């Protein structure tokens, strides 16, 4: 974990924070919903420990060369440390969910930096075209792993609902599909427990979603008032209803499980041993020294 610590210590200049929303206006495009076959959808089953040990090597190819990622991460580290010092709820949320600090910072970086989450999801949607594409052209392996693990840890925390009823608004794109169809978002999809929040992001398509694999991330979001629920790219949904309202589409989706083309793609194809117990805290200990959180 040494390189991870060094990268975080280095720091980067601050830049302005922009609200996370899509650009409004322009012609509406139609895009058909599908199973997002090119999405990188790894769930890292049975390789959590190996993947965590690979993070220092991955940092050399992601944190250092790609300044936007490093800058967003550095700002998230600073903001999380400041939040934890003034807001006991942040500390309680971290301990209550057993969320590793690295995962908390990944969630914060994802929600606070407009350029990062857009560029990241653009890459996630295409990095699954081949394993070679993932290995050599996908420069967000660390962020993908940490977000995936964060959602899993949050969902396993005591008191988290099994399924959540959420909304997602999209501007400028009218999605099409048919009732009964199985689909995936194919990216980390931001949704909200509040319908009015989704409408702020757009109304060209409004998704009303019952998710059973998304997690409530409000305690780790830069915008907690949005009551965000983040859905992983591998969750599948059944289209239950589609309604057209003028130029806008209203689509109901119900969780139908998960589907992944990849598992532990960073490692050669072979049987992987189960992760040993006691991994939780390895990244936490390293990052706590940097952020000054308890």
Region locations from a protein language model:
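N-terminal signal peptide
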Residues: 7-48, 287-294
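Sec-dependent signal peptide recognition
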Residues: 1-7, 280-281
């Amino acid at each position: 974990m040494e390189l991870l610590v060094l990268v975080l210590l280095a720091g980067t200049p601050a830049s302005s924070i922009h609200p996370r929303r899509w650009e409004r206006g322009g012609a509406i495009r139609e895009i058909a919903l599908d199973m997002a076959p090119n999405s990188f959808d790894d769930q890292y089953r049975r390789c959590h420990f190996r993947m965590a040990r690979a993070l220092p090597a991955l940092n050399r190819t992601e944190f250092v060369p790609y300044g936007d990622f490093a800058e967003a991460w550095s700002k998230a580290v600073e903001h999380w440390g400041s939040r934890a010092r003034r807001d006991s709820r942040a500390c309680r949320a971290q301990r209550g969910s057993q969320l590793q600090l690295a995962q908390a910072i990944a969630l914060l970086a994802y929600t606070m930096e407009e350029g990062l989450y857009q560029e990241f999801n653009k890459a996630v949607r295409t990095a699954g075209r081949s394993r070679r594409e993932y290995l050599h052209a996908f420069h967000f392996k660390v962020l993908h792993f940490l977000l995936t693990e964060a959602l899993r840890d949050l969902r396993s925390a005591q008191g988290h609902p099994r399924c959540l009823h959420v909304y997602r608004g999209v501007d400028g794109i009218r999605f099409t599909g048919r009732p009964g169809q199985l689909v995936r978002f194919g990216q980390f999809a931001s949704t909200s427990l509040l319908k009015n929040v989704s409408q702020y992001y757009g109304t060209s398509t409004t998704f009303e979603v019952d998710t059973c694999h998304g997690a409530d991330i409000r305690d780790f979001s830069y915008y907690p008032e949005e009551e965000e629920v983040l859905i992983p790219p591998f969750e599948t949904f059944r289209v239950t209803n589609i309604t057209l309202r003028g130029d806008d589409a209203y689509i109901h989706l119900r969780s139908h499980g998960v589907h992944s083309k990849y598992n532990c793609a960073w490692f050669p194809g072979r049987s992987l041993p189960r992760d040993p117990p006691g991994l939780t805290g390895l990244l936490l200990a390293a990052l706590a020294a940097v952020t000054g959180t308890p």
